[in-house]
């Protein structure tokens, strides 16, 4: 991508980006095209497919849960075309790295609402907690322990006692205790990974100022 086209894309994306400045957007665009290994050609949209994106989540942000990584991919891939384009990349990372608590609550709830019906059901909690907990070899029936954990979680978070979590239940619980934001699995970067990523990507502002 030539310098003029890069600058135009940077300007366009910066206008619609809440949490990154122009320099940071420019750095993330460059990183995106490095990751996809090419530029946009006539009639062909370049993007990160599910496997490439999951690799970034695993290597860069230390995520290991396949189910959660798939859900994070869907959270970024807003048009559901099977790949994350440059616009989705910038918007997704804006929330992923620097989103407000409100933005992160909406995002995490969507990740945890596996079937998209607007609720986190007991079954969904069970699947996510089963994936995220280490199995103890001494346990005869590890599923029983997970079922108990689901009940404990519901008791703490299900404010209207209907046996499932609505967004209102979840929001209230998280505002009371922010540790519950990622109650069903890590779907945001930890502070160390976030700082390392930003330090690595957002460097050499002089190069940008020369544009």
UniProtKB/Swiss-Prot annotation:
Single GO molecular function: calcium ion binding
Pfam hit, one: EF-hand_7
Keyword annotations of the record: Calcium, Cell projection, Ciliopathy, Cilium, Cytoplasm, Cytoskeleton, Disease variant, Flagellum, Kartagener syndrome, Metal-binding, Primary ciliary dyskinesia, Repeat
Cell membrane is among the record's keywords: no
InterPro entries to which the protein is assigned, alphabetical: EF-hand-dom_pair, EF_Hand_1_Ca_BS, EF_hand_dom, Recoverin
Gene3D superfamilies: EF-hand
Compartment(s): Cytoplasm, Cytoskeleton, Cilium axoneme; Cell projection, Cilium; Cell projection, Cilium, Flagellum
Binding annotation for Ca(2+) 3: 158, 160, 162, 164, 169
Superkingdom per UniProt: Eukaryota
Segments crossing the lipid bilayer: none
Keyword Repeat tagged: yes
CDD domains, per the entry: EFh
Main location: cytoplasm
Tissues with expression: Strong expression in the respiratory epithelium. Expressed in the sperm.
Binding site for Ca(2+) 2: 113, 115, 117, 124
Example of a GO cellular component annotation carried by this entry: cytoskeleton
Residues annotated to bind Ca(2+) 1: 77, 79, 81, 83, 88
UniProt domain EF-hand: residue ranges: 64-99, 100-135, 145-180
Subunit structure: Component of the outer dynein arm-docking complex along with ODAD1, ODAD2, ODAD3 and ODAD4.
Its biological purpose: Component of the outer dynein arm-docking complex (ODA-DC) that mediates outer dynein arms (ODA) binding onto the doublet microtubule. Seems to regulate the assembly of both ODAs and their axonemal docking complex onto ciliary microtubules. Regulates ciliary and flagellar motility and is required for cilia-driven determination of body laterality.
Disease: Ciliary dyskinesia, primary, 53: A form of primary ciliary dyskinesia, a disorder characterized by abnormalities of motile cilia. Respiratory infections leading to chronic inflammation and bronchiectasis are recurrent, due to defects in the respiratory cilia. Some patients exhibit randomization of left-right body asymmetry and situs inversus. Primary ciliary dyskinesia associated with situs inversus is referred to as Kartagener syndrome. CILD53 is an autosomal recessive form characterized by randomization of the left-right body asymmetry and respiratory symptoms.
Name of the protein in question: Calaxin
Origin organism lineage: Eukaryota, Metazoa, Chordata, Craniata, Vertebrata
């Amino acid at each position: 991508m030539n310098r003029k086209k890069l600058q135009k894309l940077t300007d366009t994306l910066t206008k619609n980006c809440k949490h990154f400045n122009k320099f940071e957007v420019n750095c993330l665009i460059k990183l995106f095209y490095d990751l996809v290994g090419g530029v946009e050609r006539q009639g062909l949209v370049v993007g990160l497919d599910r496997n490439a994106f999951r690799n970034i989540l695993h290597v860069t942000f230390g995520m290991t849960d396949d189910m959660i990584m798939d859900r994070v991919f869907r959270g970024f891939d807003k048009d559901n075309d099977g790949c994350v384009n440059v616009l989705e990349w910038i918007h997704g990372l804006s929330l992923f790295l620097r989103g407000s608590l409100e933005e992160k609550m909406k995002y995490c709830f969507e990740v945890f609402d596996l079937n998209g019906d607007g609720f986190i059901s007991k079954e969904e909690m069970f699947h996510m907690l089963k994936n995220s907990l280490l199995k103890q070899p001494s346990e005869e029936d590890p599923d029983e322990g997970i079922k108990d954990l689901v009940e404990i979680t519901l008791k703490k978070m299900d404010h209207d006692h209907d046996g499932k979590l609505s967004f209102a239940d979840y929001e209230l619980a998280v505002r009371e205790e922010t540790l519950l934001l990622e109650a069903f699995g890590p779907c945001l970067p930890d502070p160390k990974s976030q700082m390392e990523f930003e330090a690595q990507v957002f460097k050499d502002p002089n190069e940008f100022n020369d544009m």
